[in-house]
A protein has these predicted regions:
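Boundary at the C-terminal end of the N-terminal hydrophobic targeting segment
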Residues: 5-7
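Globin-like tetrapyrrole-binding proteins
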Residues: 38
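Cell-wall glycan-active module
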Residues: 41
């Protein structure tokens, strides 16, 4: 799957392990665990060469969120857009958070 990054550069994203439907089939504890892991994974992107500035919006947005808050954002995003059921959950999660978080530079 390809998405547009902040700089409008097209990047290719691997499929990950789950789809939006898989997420909705998870228990609440599994959703919270997934949400925690997804945030942790995104926050270490600079270890893999991503500019630290690219995750500042995520740090600011999720600073005071609980795992339940993040899981609810993902659930609401998938639930409000049926097309998300068949998409790769890693990309759906990013888009859900980007949609829920204020845009910052």
């Amino acid at each position: 799957m390809s998405i547009y990054a902040h700089s409008q550069q097209t990047v290719s994203i691997g499929p990950g392990f789950f789809t939006g439907k898989d997420y909705l089939d998870m228990t609440d504890n599994e959703r919270r665990a997934y949400a925690t892991g997804a945030i942790n994974g995104m926050l270490v992107a600079p270890f893999f060469g991503a500019p630290a500035d690219n995750v500042n919006w995520l740090k600011a947005c999720t600073l005071k969120m609980s795992d339940e808050d993040v899981a609810a954002i993902i659930s609401k995003y998938i639930g409000s857009q049926e097309s998300q059921l068949n998409y790769n959950l890693n990309v759906v999660t990013f888009n859900a958070l980007r949609n829920a978080c204020p845009k910052t530079k």
